[in-house]
């Protein structure tokens, strides 16, 4: 199933995540998400800089530029190039993922996010 079909299917709804934590140390930004229910979609979005997403608990399906990247089971690291739209769907309950952004040299004060 592609991310566009998921976003249009009433069975799959974009939901606010119960827990998001932000930490910044020496220009490294970490955004940690806890996704309590499977089938929850972390909305498609894009950043102007490359980053990695660490799946630390559970499993997700990932998309990049509307094409599936496949299933990732914890522990897993997903590299997201700059300017690539990406999204995640929890395949299990209690997924924990962390996005790590190195902003050194980018001139940004925080990770810029544009949702679609």
Predicted segment positions?
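A short, N-terminal "cap"/entry segment at the start of jelly-roll beta-barrel domains
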Residues: 1-32, 42-43, 113-116
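Short histidine-centered beta-strand/loop micro-motifs
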Residues: 21-23, 41-47, 64, 70-71, ...
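Ligand-binding loop in jelly-roll beta-barrel domains
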Residues: 82-108
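Beta-strand-connecting loops/turns
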Residues: 38-39, 83
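Short acidic-glycine-tyrosine-enriched beta hairpin
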Residues: 66-82
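Short, conserved beta-strand element in jelly-roll/cupin
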Residues: 35, 46-62
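Short beta-strand segments in beta-sandwich/barrel cores
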Residues: 40-42, 58-63, 77-78
